[in-house]
């Protein structure tokens, strides 16, 4: 199979080198680019951590990511983020970030329930401005970062119905654990990767079948395990929804890799995943939906 240069729809970087430890660090573009090349990634979309630089998160602000993308547009694009303030100015702020080059909103992590008025303002404006949203989901307000939904994702379904023009990209454990019909309901278990075979009746497949504005960010081990836990089911899901799934990594440094990318390569090489689905997931959808 001819090598395909992937587009990674979910990457975190620091604009400048930061202090590092052996356990954790955030790469800058110079360090990440060779790693991307090793993984067959030609371009990556940067996730913003905040609208404005904050001491507790000294990397990944809108301004930082905009600067990275403007300095090297052949390798980087960026999504903007919003801080939870001034709801009435949300449309204007998002329009300004789009004018500055933002291709979407992400990753949206405001720790409020999905039907919160501020989040609904974001969803509405995103639809009007044609800015897709990559969201991180949490099982409970105050438990972990991310927008919040209940077991079974009832609030997400309401949002998909209420904002049909808005493209929602699901991400994180609490979203992808709902791939299986036996998804847990306890908050700790909802924040874990899925294990074992996928049981029928999962809410993620059901919502994908019902709502064409639901998309999937295939990053990290949350999405990786959703696919790899049951390879036969995973391959069927990839084929069925190939138009709405995006290869992504969620890497923050050049020491990280996730297994799904190589697995997609292997499955396509042996004919288990169609070349058409592979090309859409790994590159074509990002080009079509985000204009990359």
Write out the residue ranges for each language-model feature.
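A general structural detector for well-ordered alpha-helical segments in enzyme core domains, enriched
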Residues: 31-35, 61-69, 93-97, 118, ...
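Acidic-and-aromatic substrate-binding clefts and catalytic sites of carbohydrate-active enzymes
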Residues: 17-27, 51-60, 83-89, 110-117, ...
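Active-site neighborhood of phospho(di)ester-bond hydrolases with catalytic His/Asp-centered motifs
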Residues: 6-9, 45-48, 79-81, 106, ...
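Catalytic pocket-lining loop regions of alpha/beta-barrel enzymes
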Residues: 103-104, 119-247, 255
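Divalent metal-dependent hydrolysis catalytic cores, especially in the metallo-beta-lactamase
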Residues: 23-25, 30-54, 75-83, 103-107
């Amino acid at each position: 199979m001819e090598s395909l240069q992937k587009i990674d729809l979910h990457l975190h970087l620091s604009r400048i080198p930061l202090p590092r430890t052996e356990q954790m660090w955030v790469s800058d573009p110079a360090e990440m680019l060779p790693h991307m090349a090793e993984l067959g990634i030609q371009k990556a979309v940067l996730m913003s951590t905040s609208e404005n630089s904050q001491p507790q998160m000294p990397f990944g602000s809108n301004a930082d990511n905009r600067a990275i993308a403007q300095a090297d547009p052949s390798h980087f694009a960026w999504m903007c983020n919003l801080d939870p303030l001034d709801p009435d100015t949300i449309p204007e702020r998002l329009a300004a970030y789009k004018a500055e080059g933002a291709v979407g909103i992400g990753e949206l992590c405001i720790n409020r329930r999905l039907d919160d008025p501020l989040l609904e303002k974001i969803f509405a404006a995103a639809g009007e401005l044609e800015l897709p949203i990559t969201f991180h989901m949490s099982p409970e307000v105050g438990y972990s970062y991310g927008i919040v939904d209940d077991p079974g994702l009832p609030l997400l379904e309401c949002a998909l119905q209420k904002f049909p023009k808005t493209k929602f990209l699901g991400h994180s454990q609490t979203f992808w654990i709902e791939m299986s019909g036996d998804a847990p309901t306890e908050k700790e278990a909802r924040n874990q990767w899925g294990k074992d075979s996928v049981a029928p009746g999962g809410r993620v497949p059901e919502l994908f079948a019902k709502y064409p504005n639901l998309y999937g960010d295939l990053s990290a081990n949350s999405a990786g395990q959703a696919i790899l836990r049951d390879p036969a089911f995973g391959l069927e899901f990839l084929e069925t929804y190939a138009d709405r799934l995006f290869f992504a990594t969620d890497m923050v440094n050049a020491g990280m890799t996730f297994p799904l990318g190589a697995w997609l390569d292997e499955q396509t090489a042996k004919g288990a995943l169609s070349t058409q689905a592979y090309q859409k997931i790994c590159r074509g959808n990002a080009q079509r939906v985000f204009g990359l």
